[in-house]
Amino acid sequence: AELVPAWPLDEYAFMLAPGQFAGLVAPQSSGMSGREVPGELRERVGPLLGRDGDGFVYIPDADMSRGLAVVGAPGMGKSALLQSVAGYQFLEQAAPSGAAAAPGRANALVVFEPKKKGAQAYRRVWQEVAARVGPPNPLYVVDLADPACRARVGLVRSDQSPRARAESVTDALERAFESGAVGAASKEALVTALWAGHYVDQDVLAAARARVPCPAFTGRASFVRYGHVLLAGQGDEAGVALAAALRDKLVAPGADEQSREVAYRLETLYGKHTPGQRDQQVKAPRNKLAQLACFDHLFDPDQDTMSFEQILERHANVVLVTGPANGHAMSDGQAELLSALLAGRLKNAIERICDGWQEQARHCTPIVDELSILARAAPEALRWFRDQGRSYGVRPIYATQYPGQVPAELRTSLLTFPVLVSFKADEAGIASEIAAQLGVDGSVWQAADVATLQPHHAAVRSSVGFASRPAFTVQTLWWRDDPARWAAAQRRGRRR
């Protein structure tokens, strides 16, 4: 018997939905149609983004100055784009274009980079610009994990009082851990120990060493190391010995009122307590401070240590390596904590010296290569850079491979930056969020459009002169593929 199909089609035919058929016979009407690059972005209006069949494509400075967000799965091109954007700003430093909204020479780049390899890439692009155009502003690579690194940035203000420094470190610890992890009692103990640690000198160490031969009582260290000892980080006997030696100094004849207050505070830790009672009191804060104790070199400034104020005033560039470097380890928790301290210090420095910078055409560009690290530890600073930083000349650039790990409120802020560049997204929910932002002008974007992007291809939502333009797709360019062509494309119409 003849086999009769269940639908009236030839055996070699197959069914198509109307939209699928339209996409085959008229590709311009398919789901990825209408993704043409706005004509204004063909002009050199900012950093080079990529190219398509019609030529180069640029990111507009005027809109990027209000915030650039870059998201995408690992290996898709996020970091390469950030390096290219930084290279454009190095070019502006070396040979200012004079174009409206361009950053020019008066622009300090502060890069939060979790990988040493990434930091080396920023150095290479800086060197490329220096060789082809002339030297940009100085660049410093700071390996936070490496005590031997000659370039250092102070984590606390040198002009702060001992108590203020103790409170700033305690606040950073509180932000870096989960809400409630640093309770009121732990916070009080941390401030006391860190405050008292400032008063340790060679006489105090000698007196403590006479009581207990502890390695921490030899050489020179910072208030963080001594604060850790006072929280029994080297054992209860060492803590008792250091506290006793400090007490003798702080209440000696002629001691000022502040010294006596520190001595009084120490009594809350080393008064009438048994070792067991004291351990219950200091165990939790000690464990928190231990994250910083092995980075003592970052809290012991010398004549070569730079402050963020100096970096900003000189419009210098600094890459902060917030990960392992040169054989020195750094855990994720330590990276978050140090990043929180650095972001807080940068925000404080900007507030102090950069008021009115936007009107003076002076800028600071924080580049955060992996937002998920800072988002957990310093969300307030990140929000401030975008929401309040504009009048201070702040031009934030945030990127992440893991937008799902960024808290929802901050992720929404990220995806609504004036310029959004999205490489392939692996998570379905994130792809949907990005697609919704790409289509805010009414154009149709689906999660699949974002999830199926090829490596080094990006979907871009931008605007020109604050007027929204339809999102588009483009192949991004890696500056190292052809440095000469990359530099030439960036420098069209540029004058020295």
Regions found by a protein language model. Give the residues of each.
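Conserved P-loop NTPase motor module
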Residues: L3-L41, V45, Q234-K249, Q280, ...
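P-loop NTPase motor core of the ASCE superfamily
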Residues: I59, L68, G98-A99, A181-A185, ...
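Basic- and hydrophobic-enriched, low-structure N-terminal and domain-boundary segments
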Residues: A1-M76, A80-V85, E92-P103, E380, ...
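A short, flexible N-terminal coil/short beta segment enriched in small residues
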Residues: S33, A329, G442
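Conserved H-loop
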Residues: A399-Q405
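P-loop NTPase motor domains
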Residues: L48-R51, D61-M64, A73-P74, L81-V394, ...
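Short, solvent-exposed coil/turn elements at secondary-structure transition points
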Residues: A145-P147, Y402, D426
